[in-house]
A protein has these predicted regions:
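Extended lipid/amphipathic-ligand handling interfaces
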Residues: 43, 54-60, 74, 84-101, ...
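N-terminal amphipathic/hydrophobic interface segments
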Residues: 6-9, 19-74, 175, 205-206
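Extended terminal
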Residues: 2-16, 283, 287-297, 301, ...
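Outer-membrane beta-barrel proteins
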Residues: 115-118, 202, 259-263, 309-313, ...
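Transmembrane beta-strands of outer-membrane beta-barrel pores
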Residues: 110, 197-199, 241, 256, ...
Length: 475
């Protein structure tokens, strides 16, 4: 072995041995807990929040120098924002020789994060004095989270969710020094996230997973996978913060989800059964949810075959209409709004009214619900379904910006596509009106006798074709 190489190896070995000796001495003689108040004060000043360590502090040197803290709490404006059973900071050893602390890794075990938005639109992690301030540069090799819980509550809208059993692995997390409004433009990272279950007041998502990659203000989340309504959904999201206004692109599909699982979120009774396919492609922009909704453009699709509608024999009800004239097409048309997008439209609907018909079942051979989305409003392109003997179609639009029905008409159509019976819906999603507002106050009211016979509208046998889409008439 060359002499120079021997010298290098001996020097390296000696240096490593010296580090081991120093580490052992520190472990024996340094009480890390004596420095806890200083650490809490420094962290509080850096974050602009109250940081407290309720448990012990420990120092480790293998596989690298680290500080372990137990029972960590971060509070802002008097309320807990983040808590963790254990937090470990991996610190680069060499900068310490120059009295510099450089954190390379952060690992959190059993953390809980509570984010809240008050009625004024302010988040609990925001500080008025820090608004518009400069954020320090950040460079972390790795951030990991295990068995975490995230809770979000929006007191302004009443929405919220809880995500449990979450793990997060972030690599190469870098933030250039910048003003706080430019945070996303100067942030870069790669990450993988998984959550066992996410619960909202309307539905539950399980086995959520996605990979994320962000650089120069552009963030790609793909693939985003989850289980919802008994189906396996997948898609991707791109968020671009490089411009003056953030832009978003969302592509999502949920094949073969169970319609009975969807209706479980609204009724304890089994409204319908069968598998359906849902997909959506949307683009939007804005800094708030309202702005994003107002600029939403794209398309949404819902399709299904061989479905069963419980509690009502539609063909029998339609055949009895001549004598009874006491059937509500709106009840039947509600099935066109099944799936993720329909949650906003149907949350105020009492689906038990569908079950008050002839106490039979209906076979739906085919259902198609195709929508075009422009500026936050969905317009029906091809919306219809066929039973064994009849077809029902829908015209009109859904205004998600204002939460209203735009001249929606549900019609019973003949083999030529002409309307035999029609019923109009207007008003808000929560308080829609059918034909005459003074008769129907909400969709949850009693069935209406508001159906108009096609022959009364179009005398002489000729009519304007109401439906010419892809759902063929029964044979």
């Amino acid at each position: 072995m060359p002499k120079s190489l021997k010298i290098i190896l001996f020097s390296v070995s000696g240096f490593v041995g010296l580090l081991v000796l120093v580490a052992a001495a520190l472990l024996l003689f340094v009480d890390a807990n004596a420095y806890k108040p200083r650490l809490e004060a420094a962290a509080s000043e850096a974050l602009g929040m109250e940081v407290r360590v309720g448990g012990r502090l420990g120092i480790g040197f293998f596989p690298g120098f680290s500080i372990t803290m137990e029972d960590v709490h971060i509070r802002n404006r008097g309320a807990d924002l983040v808590s963790a059973k254990e937090a470990r900071l991996g610190i680069d050893l060499f900068p310490l020789l120059h009295k510099q602390v450089r954190i390379a890794k952060i690992a959190l075990k059993h953390p809980g994060v509570s984010i809240e938005r008050d009625r004024g639109g302010r988040y609990n992690f925001e500080n008025a004095e820090a608004a518009g301030g400069t954020l320090p540069a950040l460079d972390l090799a790795k951030v990991s989270v295990s068995d975490g819980t995230l809770r979000y509550a929006d007191k302004q809208s009443g929405d919220g969710f809880e995500a449990k059993d979450c793990s997060l692995d972030v690599r190469r997390l870098r933030l250039a020094e910048a003003k706080s409004p430019d945070l996303m433009k100067n942030l870069s990272f790669t990450a993988e996230l998984a959550c066992g279950v996410i619960r909202t007041k309307d539905f539950t998502v399980s086995d959520l997973k996605f990979s994320a990659d962000g650089k120069n203000g552009v963030f790609d989340l793909k693939p985003v996978t989850m289980r919802i309504f008994g189906g396996q959904g997948s898609g991707n999201i791109r968020a671009d913060f490089s411009g003056a206004v953030p832009t978003y692109q969302v592509h999502y599909s949920l094949p073969q989800f169970r319609i009975e699982e969807f209706y479980k979120t609204m009724s304890k009774q089994k409204i319908a059964e069968g598998s359906m396919d849902f997909s959506a492609n949307l683009s939007m922009q804005g800094k708030t949810v309202n702005e994003m909704t107002q600029t939403a453009n794209g398309a949404a699709s819902l399709r299904g075959e061989n479905l069963t509608l419980n509690g009502s024999d539609l063909d029998l009800e339609f055949s009895r209409f001549e004598s009874s004239q006491n059937f509500n097409l709106v009840d039947v048309g509600a099935i066109f709004f099944a799936g993720p997008v329909g949650l906003a439209v149907t949350k105020g609907y009492n689906f038990a009214s569908i079950l008050k018909g002839s106490r039979g079942n209906s076979a739906i051979r085919r259902l198609v619900s195709e929508w075009k989305v422009e500026r936050g409003a969905a317009q029906a392109l091809d919306v219809a379904m066929a039973t064994n003997e009849n077809r029902i179609a829908l015209h009109g639009g859904l205004d998600f910006v204002n939460g209203r029905f735009n001249d929606v008409t549900v019609a019973l159509i003949d083999s030529k596509g002409c309307a035999k019976v029609r019923q109009k819906i207007s008003g808000t999603f929560r308080k829609p009106v059918v034909e005459k507002p003074n008769i129907l106050k909400t969709l949850t009211g009693p069935a209406l006798r508001l159906l108009k016979k096609g022959r009364d509208i179009f005398p002489g046998g000729e009519c304007e074709v109401f439906y010419a889409g892809s759902v063929a008439p029964p044979k």
